[in-house]
Amino acid sequence: MNLRFVFKLVGRVELMVAASLLLPLAVALFYGESPWHFVLTMGLILCVCAPLARMPAQPVFFQREGFVIVGLIWVVTCLFGSLPFWFSGCFASFVDCLFEASSGFTTTGATILPDIEALPQGIQFWRCFTHWLGGMGVLVLATAVFPSLGARSQYLTRAETPGPMVVKLVPKQAKTSKILYGIYCAMTLAVIALLWGAGMPLYDAAVHAFSIAGTGGFSSRNASFAAYPLPGVDLIVATATLLFSLNFGLFFLALRRRFREIWRSEELRFFLAVVALATVLIAWDLDPVYHQGALESLRYAFFHVTSVISTSGFFTEDYALWPQFSQMVLVLLMFCGSCSSSTGGGIKCARVLILLRILRREVRRIAHPRCVEVIKMDGRVVESSTIRGTLVFLGCYMLILLAAGLIISLDGYSFSISFSSALASLSNVGPGLELVGPTGNFSLLSPLSKVTMSLCMVTGRLEIFPILVLFSRAVWRHT
């Protein structure tokens, strides 16, 4: 284990986090607020991480170091990111600050705040900006900024990129990262322009665009997008969250005008089919409730289906009050999640597709024991290592979900609250059901449950293994 390089890279990335605090600091100054919570945080990060970043180390690392670097950076980033909240005095405890920061960077969108609008503008901006930073991944940004990492940077992006397979658009990983971030920035600016053009104030358009881009769910308003009864806003948000839920490699193909290759993506077709089916089912279930016609029911359904499957967690209605069938459909979407190599969370549609094809193959083997059938996606054979990794991931996911739900249930709340809290944090969705639904918050949970959920958020965002590696004795044995 090349520990010197591990700590050096952690230090360099955290200095980037410190630099990102300049934006909320400028917002605080613009609105005449105290900037000292940002200044203190930047100073502390500089004192701790500047010596690490200057540490002499050989840039030699492999998959083991890659997973350790990713796990450490995300844990340390959440800790440092919680300091502006703590220094601002707006939060009751450091555990609450850690919960909010973890929810921000992992793009979960769960909150412990009963009154978001009481926060200073600078803190609100930082809260939503953490979604944007965490959406594409801090290590993907680091790879774009530090091309000196060379070919070995694939170990970092492999550990951080969501999904069973890693997107590589061009031979050099650093150039791939730059392309991805270029697309990410362009789409974010487009969302800001659209929301501003639809009638939102520029500040609100910006902070909500950060949340939409990261498929996070934080808002500057207590009522989320229900506070903006402007024509077209919900359609802009639903369409944008849908786009950010897609594999970013598809946007690269679109820029190259390779549209046939885009439609060949089986994950894309599966994802769109799930969205369409869920929208129709929920609209059919809601029609007798709202009595506003099929179009209004489809509008409500489409917004919340895209919000949940993208793991954004925005809302215009309290779906915790919807019929049980609609709530069950949304819970299933929480499991499914978005596409691989997107900013969304969940299990990912590619894994669901692989699992369905494994099930189909096993059923056929029962009928035809000598049958030899390979699993394919997009016309290519899925490697056995990918199949094994998918099954191990799903097994770990369910075990962590059950363990987290068990710990949260110690607070004495209902099964729906305990289970949906665990699922919402592990899948990075944000809101759960009942008291922790869209119009509620997680302040009622105990510190143990909040820490458990914070750990689940990071574990779910990194897709389990980089966090498990940190607790593996075998990884640290030969340091």
What would you call each of these model-derived segments?
Residues 1-479:
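Membrane-proximal intracellular helices of multi-pass ion channels
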